[in-house]
């Protein structure tokens, strides 16, 4: 992306929900590089897919020559943002928050370039300026610039105040002031002139703009990216198992890859604009190719490869593709021991068996059949596979050759019902 018309390019990709003083911001960007920031609160030990669009937006600005600041909220994470939350967040201990801060800092780092000259990225933590601030300083230097009347009229706060079952605590009510002061601090320390965030952050961002103007007499700007929804109206970034995380220990590269493979045709080309750096001409050409090919669309695989490779690297992408191909073909020869561990992590039904168990018992224990009698019937009808190979002998006893890496056997009943055996 070029800097001269960056806002327009972001809009063409559907990446702008709201922007303050668009003409003035476009003019400022055309004059030369700026510093901008996006904040990530450590409310869990990993970022999830909802964080990916603003994080990639930081990267888009850096590629256009601007300097990104990734702010991890060591202070704000101890309170929790009430914006559009139905109830108050659980408060985590300082040790927990500090641990999560470090994990998220490491997670953000690969997306940005911290050693590229004048626009090298900066990592910041708002605990650095809030940790030593006392309550009198906070009230005198920050609180006096805020009108309670305006604060309670912000949509995110109004929604909580209007709920019969829960109001809002003073702790969460004060969050808006803390995030606003982040903007003012980063403006003073690094010349930050733009904050980006999800559209639920609009009220916090505009508060920061007002406070920066009052404290430093500087004109600064805000830009929000849309909260992503799917064409069918359901939430993006959720599966039956919960959120899709960027941490491979919480969502494996294989499961992450499968999430994108399962993207609906109605969403996939839009998601290519949001989550990849393919130019619009490439995306439009791919859409046209898929429409005219008469085959299953390629777009989901392009999306899955792009995003999985970006988040999990070449090794993670290779593992995801290897597992996908192996399960589809039934040929498990290319799978590694770590690949089988990924399947267990991802929630594939897994059982432990002693080495004297036969195939009938394994099917019953795996809950692939209700009884040994039913197991005999399924095996005899050629409906059971061991490591991808059909087995029709109802009296079959496992051999060492069935125990891949000495410990794993993959059972399949029919085409879709799997269970992984971990041998004791």
From Swiss-Prot:
Coiled coil: none
Domain of life: Bacteria
Reactions that this protein is recorded to catalyse: tRNA(Tyr) + L-tyrosine + ATP = L-tyrosyl-tRNA(Tyr) + AMP + diphosphate + H(+)
Residue positions of motif 'KMSKS' region: 235-239
The keyword Ligase is assigned to this record: yes
Annotated InterPro entries: aa-tRNA-synth_I_CS (IPR001412), aa-tRNA-synth_Ic (IPR002305), Rossmann-like_a/b/a_fold (IPR014729), S4_RNA-bd (IPR002942), S4_RNA-bd_sf (IPR036986), SYY-like_C (IPR054608), Tyr-tRNA-ligase (IPR002307), Tyr-tRNA-ligase_bac-type (IPR024088)
SMART domains per UniProt: S4
Residues reported to bind L-tyrosine: 37, 175, 179
All residue ranges annotated as the S4 RNA-binding domain in the record: 357-414
NCBIfam families: tyrS
UniProt protein name: Tyrosine--tRNA ligase
